[in-house]
Curated annotation (Swiss-Prot):
It comes from the Eukaryota. It comes from Caenorhabditis elegans. ATP binds at residues 302-304, 318, 391-394. This is Probable serine--tRNA ligase, cytoplasmic. It catalyses: tRNA(Ser) + L-serine + ATP = L-seryl-tRNA(Ser) + AMP + diphosphate + H(+); tRNA(Sec) + L-serine + ATP = L-seryl-tRNA(Sec) + AMP + diphosphate + H(+).
Length: 487
């Protein structure tokens, strides 16, 4: 995930000041821009010398051939003057013609040695430049609020009654319908482990079906993704911080060959956005094939490092969950990606309106954007039992930031020269099932149980078609009784 390097080159029409401003607006170090420019200049100088040396090697070989053809004396002394060696990459043809065959052969050896050194310098500078480049975020859209404080997220619009209060939170409700076992889940899987059971298994499948059916009508192709990604591919779609805070690493045998002791590193996906972004890796996509719309279906795995103490009970924030994701590839022209951005957040809004879940859509402040997003909208549902807004959807336009590193190019033919455009990529949650379950439970609770939203009743079994009864007491009430008893 990177910006176009030409954006840092003024002679190529780039404007580094725009990138510095974007970095400042993200509350990130703008000095990275200057470091990229410095390393790029070093890289270009070494690249120029490497090209010169390559041409010089060909010229020397040609000069040797001509002398051999003319049967000129080859000479016995291969020593070459220091001033010639110093100008190894700049020697002219007439200077080469004055040297003997053995001198030219010595010169060719020196060119080869210098080429190896220069090639190493080219690679070193390119790698150093890349390490700095990937730390610089996408250019922020002008409509993003510049702030580091999430309290300044701009509310774009709302739906439903956002003032209602209800008795129980999702933490209690999942237990009351006997749809969750966290104690056994923790024994089996560790912290935040859980078993989903009974009515909530059916509810989860109904939520998924509604999402897939609605996206299918909109032309989104369902794509069930791998759960693992190779390290080198994951590095092209994930930020460095995600490797430490979010991603699970899995080590296994490098091959199925008996006796092979090599180790293969893979990473569990945190979202289907990651494998789908890489689905067209190293491909050229014709204009007539765009936009390409996918409905990603996957289990997601997240370490949730940094979330210690947050949402430790229930199923709102867990290490493993199911998710339906919108992912779109489109033309980089005519602001098409911004039109699709509106469509994708609109798809999510329609979905939650069908489920009658109240929400607000917020424009995320600049300091809270991930590197890839030029702009991000979150859909935050109102949880009347918790008395809080909770994020259910994130919708991001990443422009060509992801596709550039993945080399997903836009066009019909492979261009040998000139600017190569890349497709734009967008992603938006449709539903992260455990979070949607929590929202449904809190918003549809009654004294006796949970009213099932009309939109998903067709996928529920007869005994839970319209209503899921409470069959266990609320943990919060049980805790209160115990506390009273102790007194």
């Amino acid at each position: 995930m990177v910006l176009d390097i030409d954006m840092f080159r003024t002679e190529k029409g780039g404007n580094p000041e725009i990138i510095r401003k974007s970095q400042q607006d993200r509350f990130k170090d703008p000095k990275l821009v200057d470091e990229v420019i410095e390393l790029d200049e070093k890289w270009r100088k070494e690249r120029f010398v490497a090209d010169q040396l390559n041409r010089q090697k060909n010229a020397i070989s040609k000069a040797i051939g001509e002398k051999m053809k003319k049967k000129e004396p080859q000479g016995t002394d291969d020593s070459v003057a220091d001033d010639i060696v110093a100008r190894l990459a700049e020697l002219k043809i007439d200077e080469l013609s004055q040297l003997t065959v053995v001198q030219l052969k010595k010169l060719r050896v020196l060119v080869d040695e210098k080429s190896v050194q220069t090639a190493a310098a080219v690679i070193a500078n390119e790698n150093a430049r890349h390490e700095k480049l990937i730390q610089i975020g996408n250019l922020i859209h002008s409509s993003v609020v510049v702030s580091k404080d999430e309290a300044n997220n701009k509310i774009e619009r709302t739906f439903g009654d956002l003032s209602t209060k209800k008795k129980y939170s999702h933490v209690d409700l999942v237990v009351m319908v006997d749809g969750f076992d966290g104690e056994r889940g923790t024994v089996v899987a560790g912290g935040r482990g859980y078993f989903l059971k009974g009515p909530l298994v059916f509810l989860e499948q109904a939520i998924i079906q509604l999402a897939l059916q609605r996206l299918n009508v909109k032309g989104y192709v369902p794509l069930y993704t791998p759960f693992f990604m190779r390290k080198e591919v994951m590095q092209e779609v994930a930020q460095l911080s995600q490797f430490d805070d979010e991603l699970y690493k899995v080590s296994s045998k490098g091959s199925e060959i008996a006796g092979d002791t090599s180790v293969d590193e893979k990473y569990l996906i945190a979202t289907s956005e990651q494998p789908i972004a890489a689905y067209h890796r190293n491909e050229w996509i014709k204009e007539t094939e765009l936009p390409i719309k996918y409905a990603g279906v996957s289990t997601c795995f997240r370490q949730e490092v940094g979330s210690h103490g947050r949402d430790t009970r229930g199923i709102f924030r867990v290490h493993q969950f199911e998710k339906i994701e919108q992912f779109v590839l489109c033309s980089p022209n005519d602001n098409e990606s911004w039109t699709l951005f509106d469509e994708m957040i609109g798809n999510a809004e329609s979905y939650y309106q069908e489920l009658q879940i109240p929400y607000q859509v917020v424009n995320i402040v600049s300091g809270e954007l991930n590197n890839a997003a030029a702009k991000k909208f979150d859909l935050e549902a109102w949880f009347p039992g918790s008395g809080a807004y909770r994020e259910l959807v994130s919708c991001s336009n990443c422009l060509d930031y992801q596709s550039r590193r993945l080399k997903v190019r836009y066009g019909q033919t492979k261009k040998l020269s000139g600017e190569v455009p890349f497709v734009h990529m967008l992603n938006a949650t449709m539903c992260a099932t455990t979070r949607v379950i929590c929202a449904i439970l809190e918003n549809n609770q009654t004294e006796e149980g949970i009213n099932v939203p009309t939109a998903i009743q067709q996928w529920m079994p007869e005994n839970y078609r319209t209503f899921i009864p409470f069959v266990k007491p609320a943990p919060i009430d049980e805790d209160a009784k115990k506390a009273t008893g102790k007194k």
